[in-house]
Amino acid sequence: RSVSAFLLNRSSDLGGYGRIYVNALSDYDYDEVIDSLTRVFGIVGICPVVQIEDNGFDDLANQVINYLDKAYKNKNLTFKVNARRTRKNYPMNSMEINMELGGRILDAFPEMKVDVHKPEVLLQVEIRGDVINIYSIEVPGPGGMPIGTAGKAMLLLSGGIDSPVAGYMVAKRGVQIEATYFHAPPYTSERAKQKVIDLAKIVSKYSGPITLN
């Protein structure tokens, strides 16, 4: 899907950790979007969230129970609730939210058990202004720095493994790369040239478009 089908919003609350919210404006392929985001340098993790309006604690508890019911068919799991607030005038503090939601979850799903050390389900509840985000899955991102934040470099791309790996590692540090390949027929074949082109395409999945000179 085109990125124009999504709305991006930036946030820097909750302790200063930067967040970018991606809201779908049309139907999309979930796996395709997650796969694309896991190849974007600068992203540490991707969290698919259910975002609701703040309509009081009872509504929040019902939404959490509904979320768990849909997300986990097997309820014989251990869990922990981790609530965080940017709106400090919320009528309950984070610890109270954790305990109250935990109690509601145990009432709804008696087979679930609390484990605050190594839970199988870490339920995150983030109260941000007038909205609340609920999630329990975090897909690891590649980390690194966003492409273009550390200048440009030229990559000497050959048909071996070292040069594409070097290109990947440099791009992960925020460097925008172009590639150069020395094609010297008859000493290098068209097959060798095509291999370099294919390697450039693989690296470009992470680095963005690469001009191959």
Q: Which role fits each region the language model picked out?
A:
Residues 161-163:
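Hydrophobic/small residue at the entry helix of a nucleotide-binding pocket
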